[in-house]
UniProtKB/Swiss-Prot annotation:
Highest taxon of the lineage: Eukaryota
Single Gene Ontology BP annotation: protein insertion into ER membrane
Alphabetical list of Pfam families matching this protein: ASTER (PF03669)
Gene Ontology cellular-component terms listed: PAT complex
PANTHER family: ADL329WP
GO MF, any single term: protein folding chaperone
UniProt KW keywords: Membrane, Transmembrane, Transmembrane helix
Keyword Transmembrane belongs to the record: yes
Protein name: Uncharacterized protein C18B11.08c
Membrane keyword on record: yes
Membrane-spanning residues: 29-53
Amino acid sequence: MAPAELKRPDLIVPYKARVKANEEVGLSLVSTATCMAALFLRFKLIAWVAFILTFSNLLNANTSPSSSPTSMAFMGIAALVSTYLPQFLNTPNKT
């Protein structure tokens, strides 16, 4: 007759969960690209998209010392400021 339990305790391997790969590289790259596009093109829609992406990147950032999400947030704010600043600095022409 066969034994009731076929598993040998010395052959059991405990489960180890896989370490997640760094997936936030894509979001960081897209937010940087949209910030730069907003700074160069001064297109308001791109500036708002860049601001939302950098804010999302800031909220989802890990606490690793190698990355600096606050500098990315300042870049998103700079994109917004650079698009709206000419409206406040231009004075009407005197006729």
